[in-house]
């Protein structure tokens, strides 16, 4: 399984992330068409601490905070800040859903999908 670097260290709040950002989504989700996972093709994909993030610009700080709350999950989670109904389907992770809903109110223009 090859992982290639897609850029230098990403800066969030003036603090650089350690290590390269890699993009293994085609390997990890090769059985699922990318069009179904991410309908728009103008986004960048980030693989960060065993999560795949899709963002129109960059990975915001609140997504980095989610890694500590989601690190023990092993199933796929889909988060869309523009579709509250999908977030509410994951009540088993109330901490994460609450944090995402707060983020959605703060950043209503953002659309981010996270997968494990």
UniProtKB/Swiss-Prot annotation:
GO CC term, one of those recorded: mitochondrial membrane
Keywords for the protein's UniProt record, in alphabetical order: Membrane, Mitochondrion, Transmembrane, Transmembrane helix
Protein name as annotated: Uncharacterized mitochondrial protein AtMg00150
Topology in the lipid bilayer: Single-pass membrane protein
Record-annotated membrane-spanning stretches: 52-72
Annotated organism of origin: Arabidopsis thaliana
UniProt-annotated location(s): Mitochondrion membrane
